[in-house]
Amino acid sequence: LQSQAGIDVVEESRKKKAENGWGFIKSFRLRVANTLSRKQHHDYSHQVYDAMAGCLACKSCAGQCPIKVNVPQFRSQFLEVYHGRYLRPLRDYIIGGTEFMLPTLAKVAPLYNALLSQRWVDSLMRKGLGMSDSPLLSRASVKKQLRAWGVAEATPASLALLTDQQRANSVIIVQDAFTSHFEAKLVMDVVELLSRLNLRVFVMPFSANGKPLQVQGFLGAFERTAEKQAKRLRALAEF
């Protein structure tokens, strides 16, 4: 359908990935105009967009389907192209930037949790952003707890000091934004379990992996974020 309308989806995707801040600003007026006039022009993409809203991006389809249809993958590709023509809801930017905001929000966890516990805040987020039942941040700080337990950070400098035997008996935990900030106790339980198994535990300093960006169709930002994370992981894998 996009091809019949004269739209090269692959080229549109390439442009969006390469788009910088200025490109985003230049296309803003066009996206505003398209969004305001969307009811006046038939675009089948709107129906696809509504259907894709029901995808949880869990990839169960890819695991269960005999031909491995990956709905989350083409959903993110569709969202990238779709929002090249139409405005995104504010919710997309909040979800996409979650990994980058969490370390800052964790510093004021009591205030954040107190606000989210208010009914009027939950109602405002539900009606204004389409978000409800947002989880509360863990009161405990993984970083502080690890420091108190004497658990070393996994860095090239710290791993370079290990002997071959020590490396064979060591394990590195790569932090996930949501587990570390919403389920800190689970992270510490894993550290304790591995320690009791006589393994030396190292924890990689937290850094975003870009998954929320990929889910919301910010594929250009996702690729840049994922490449940075992959570079960090490759540096540790050398040891």
Regions found by a protein language model. Name each.
Residues 1-28:
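Internal glycine-rich alpha/beta core junctions
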Residues 14-15, 24-208, 213-239:
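Iron-sulfur-cluster electron-transfer modules
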